[in-house]
Amino acid sequence: MRPSKRAPEELRKVTLERGVARYAEGSCLVTFGETRVLCTASLEERGPSWLRGSGKGWITAEYAMLPRATHERNRREVNAGKPSGRTQEIQRLIGRSLRAVVNLPAIGERQIVIDCDVLQADGGTRTASITGAWVALHECFTWMRSRSIISVDPMRDHVAAVSCGIHKGTPILDLDYAEDSAAETDANFVITGSGGIVEVQGTAEVTPFSEEEFLGLLRLAKSGVAQLVALQKQAVG
């Protein structure tokens, strides 16, 4: 039995509530069990200078954790002078994941900034951020179309993310913090609604895992992402 008492293939309770930030063009409060992340999408009329004249837009992301999102208070990274390596890695992952399913020329030479702020962390903050950020971005595109800023929907597909791992020899889906800490293997999968793989991050914490075990985790992740995509569809109507 896994520490959370869930079945091996069972997600935590996931909710996606859009329209939670009054001023943002798009927003979503996402929960994966006790993990809670506020995702917002902000439209900037000017894109990056290096894309000027290309006719393409850009999507970038920033990620942060509130100081007391964890068991003990963490120092705000702004006071350290720069984001940690972990934060930079997650920011880039969120941006890459969203750009993989967006027609960037359809945005025009504009930039959309995704902010993912972790209110409470219990494992899977990066996977929750990607899943919720897609909803916030979808709402931003809807806002842009309603004001004739863009004429077509730039969104080409859904994208969501989920963690998988091997705990006491058993493959499990959507690890919370206790499970992640005790897992022999853990991995994050970013997958599109049509089944395309955007990114895989996997680590053997104890002993190397086999190709067969990896493929088992991939199958588990695809089943989890299919459920998350269904929830995204419900959230955006």
Swiss-Prot record:
SUPFAM superfamilies: Ribonuclease PH domain 2-like (SSF55666), Ribosomal protein S5 domain 2-like (SSF54211)
Recorded catalytic activity of this chain's protein: tRNA(n+1) + phosphate = tRNA(n) + a ribonucleoside 5'-diphosphate
Annotated EC: 2.7.7.56
UniProt-listed PROSITE patterns: RIBONUCLEASE_PH (PS01277)
Pfam families xref list: RNase_PH, RNase_PH_C
InterPro entries (alphabetical): ExoRNase_PH_dom1, ExoRNase_PH_dom2, ExoRNase_PH_dom2_sf, PNPase/RNase_PH_dom_sf, Ribosomal_Su5_D2-typ_SF, RNase_PH, RNase_PH_bac-type, RNase_PH_CS
List of residues binding phosphate: 86, 124-126
Subunit structure: Homohexameric ring arranged as a trimer of dimers.
Primary role: Phosphorolytic 3'-5' exoribonuclease that plays an important role in tRNA 3'-end maturation. Removes nucleotide residues following the 3'-CCA terminus of tRNAs; can also add nucleotides to the ends of RNA molecules by using nucleoside diphosphates as substrates, but this may not be physiologically important. Probably plays a role in initiation of 16S rRNA degradation (leading to ribosome degradation) during starvation.
Cross-referenced HAMAP family: RNase_PH
Entry similarity comment: Belongs to the RNase PH family.
Descriptive protein name: Ribonuclease PH
